[in-house]
UniProtKB/Swiss-Prot annotation:
Catalysis performed (reactions): uridine(38/39/40) in tRNA = pseudouridine(38/39/40) in tRNA
Family: Belongs to the tRNA pseudouridine synthase TruA family.
The enzyme's E.C. designation: 5.4.99.12
Binding residues for substrate: 109
Alphabetical list of SUPFAM superfamilies matching this protein: Pseudouridine synthase (SSF55120)
Organism of provenance: Burkholderia vietnamiensis (strain G4 / LMG 22486)
Native organism taxonomy: Bacteria, Pseudomonadati, Pseudomonadota, Betaproteobacteria, Burkholderiales
Signal peptide, first to last residue: none
Keyword Membrane set for record: no
Superkingdom of the organism of origin: Bacteria
EC supergroup of this enzyme: isomerase
Protein name in UniProt: tRNA pseudouridine synthase A
Gene: truA
One Pfam family it belongs to: PseudoU_synth_1
Length: 270
């Protein structure tokens, strides 16, 4: 039997998603909890690996098991063995044709950026922060140059293991709400550090360091050295993974973040 899980986690509490010998990752915590509940080791396959500090609101995994248990039993039973910084939101039996990674046709990330002269300790690890004003319109104009199918080598980490740097970026939205600016990135897939590198460039344009069309040159150059430094991970959230309707994957629970109403207005889930 194949089971899919929806997982939420506080990325600040872990050293990324992927299992490591030190055991301090989200995958390590989840598989330990699943093993405790199932009384047998279980291995998970994830929709998208996230880095240290990156949060998961709509992460999806699957695993195979011979155990026949009610779907909600997997939720309650696994959560009983998880730390408070990670939680299974739903469980669903899936056909063998479902694959958490390869069945997905799109991913959506949000970035919450706090723009204020003084940082807020209440937002530590929850939102990015910059103390200088930003030009929203300039960032929107710059984002236009990135939309479409492109070689995103200029925004790719040197550690990226993707087979190709070509991705299709469907949409970038920028929305101000009080002292926050919220960004939404939707694509078929993302390269390692791609969203944080895009954020670094958009913020550089917003600060007036470069004109909006600078991003067109960075993209065309296909050279990471042309782009701005990688932006902080704190405000980055994997919010949604899109799957074909036949799998009826439950929607992510975005209401667990304070600015969920802004995100819902910015991006009603498909």
């Amino acid at each position: 039997m194949r089971i899919a899980l929806g997982v939420q986690y506080d990325g600040a509490a872990f050293c990324g998603w992927q299992a490591q010998p030190h055991g301090k990752t989200v995958q390590d915590a989840l598989e330990r909890a699943l093993g405790e509940f199932a009384c047998v080791p279980l291995h998970t396959t994830v929709a998208g690996r996230t880095d240290t500090g990156v949060h998961g609101l709509g992460q999806v995994v699957h695993f195979d098991t011979a155990l026949d248990r009610a779907e909600f039993s997997w939720v309650r039973g696994t959560n009983a063995f998880l730390p408070p910084t990670v939680s299974v939101q739903w469980a669903k039996a899936m056909p063998d044709t479902f694959h958490a990674r390869f069945s997905a046709f799109e991913r959506t990330y949000y970035y919450a950026l706090y723009v204020h002269p003084v940082r807020s300790p209440m937002l530590a690890g929850r939102a990015g922060w910059i103390h200088t004003p930003l030009d929203d319109d300039a960032m929107r104009a710059a984002a236009v140059h990135l939309i479409g199918e492109h070689d995103f080598s200029s925004f790719r980490s040197s550690e990226c293991q993707s087979k190709t740097p070509v991705k299709h970026l469907y949409q970038i939205d920028v929305r101000r709400s009080g002292h926050f600016i919220h960004f939404r990135f939707r694509a078929n897939a993302f390269l390692h550090h791609m969203v944080r590198n895009l954020m670094g460039c958009l913020v550089a344009v917003g600060r007036g360091r470069y004109p909006a069309d600078w991003l067109a040159d960075v993209l065309a150059g296909r050279d990471r050295n042309l782009a701005a430094p990688t932006f902080m991970a704190d405000g980055l959230y994997l919010a949604h993974v899109g799957y074909p309707a036949e799998f009826a994957v439950p929607p992510a629970q975005l209401g667990s973040v304070p600015w969920s109403s802004v995100w819902a207005d910015l991006d009603p889930q498909p």
